[in-house]
Amino acid sequence: MLYNIARPLLFSLDPETAHELSLAALHFFGRVLPAATPTESDPVDVMGLHFPNRIGLAAGLDKNGEAIDGLARLGFGFLEIGTITPRPQPGNPRPRMFRLPEVRAIINRMGFNNHGVDALVANVRAAKYRGILGINIGKNFDTPIDRAADDYLACLDKVYALASYVTVNISSPNTKNLRQLQGESELDDLLGRLKARQQQLADRHGRYVPLTLKIAPDLEPAQVTNIADALRRHRIDGVIATNTTIARDKVQGVRYAEQQGGLSGAPVFEASTAVVAQLSRALAGELPIIAAGGILDGRGARAKLAAGASLVQVYSGLIYRGPSLIAECVRATTDFADSGHAATSASFGA
């Protein structure tokens, strides 16, 4: 209800300004209110972690972990913050975020703007939240692609003790050449080094923190199969499908469609769900899938589970629907496995 009142004001502002105001409000309420208790509804165990419900926040909304406690009050089963890089960086010049309300979409070319991993670590330490927290890591824009692994390892070292799981983001279209890391040889090298460091850190801290990989929707079937093979080969703990798309076929003729950057929201739903389904078939249950991309209602969340996901994440849908989307998705995915109405993954992207 409150969001329905606030939305016209927020939509009258530049999208990034509205984003900053929303984060500031969440930060304020998180500080002045007591710690939130996660909403328990059909809890599920995934990657050795206990999720109170299947609905999470996707990375990108709170890059620096500044509003963790406020976000925790919205009913999520888990939060993912970031993407964070080893050193602070400003990202791309403004304007770099655009609303496409006719199709309930967003285009962004933020470019991993963030305050650096040390600032995020300080914010996480200061937070009251004790639920499941994923931390999404990336590389600095000026780090050569052949040295990208060094940036991921530097971030992993610093966030490991604080994260419930760590996501390796190799799929943003807004960092030059980043998606090259989805290539077969590049991915093998990166995952091999990350897995070795994960084991070292687990021994050092006495705690195993799962690693997930976030991939793009703009992949050929053979590429998805190769990625699935690499995930199994390196015993990665999970995969997030998907990031934003560079495709524009669903938004032709829409204002701002020509803007460079990643497209999220409703137009990416079909392609993203097809990747989830293909991963599900290729992985055959060997590791869990966290689905993100175009979830605007409870039916969308259920469709992701039907395609083979264990958990789902939302972000762009929050911009158009507000926090009520979270409760709707939680209700829609409760008792999903026992509902008897689930489609099989063969229904998507066959």
Swiss-Prot record:
Keyword Zinc-finger tagged: no
Membrane topology value: Peripheral membrane protein
Gene Ontology biological-process annotations: 'de novo' pyrimidine nucleobase biosynthetic process; 'de novo' UMP biosynthetic process
CDD domains associated with the record: DHOD_2_like
Active site residues according to the UniProt entry: 172 (nucleophile)
Superkingdom per UniProt: Bacteria
Cofactor binding comment, as recorded: Binds 1 FMN per subunit.
GO terms for MF: dihydroorotate dehydrogenase (quinone) activity
Positions annotated to bind FMN: 59-63, 83, 136, 169, 214, 242, 265, 294, 315-316
Necessary cofactors: FMN
Record-listed E.C. numbers: 1.3.5.2
Subunit: Monomer.
Stated role: Catalyzes the conversion of dihydroorotate to orotate with quinone as electron acceptor.
Name of the protein in its database record: Dihydroorotate dehydrogenase (quinone)
Species, as recorded: Aromatoleum aromaticum (strain DSM 19018 / LMG 30748 / EbN1)
Upper classification of the organism: Bacteria, Pseudomonadati, Pseudomonadota, Betaproteobacteria, Rhodocyclales
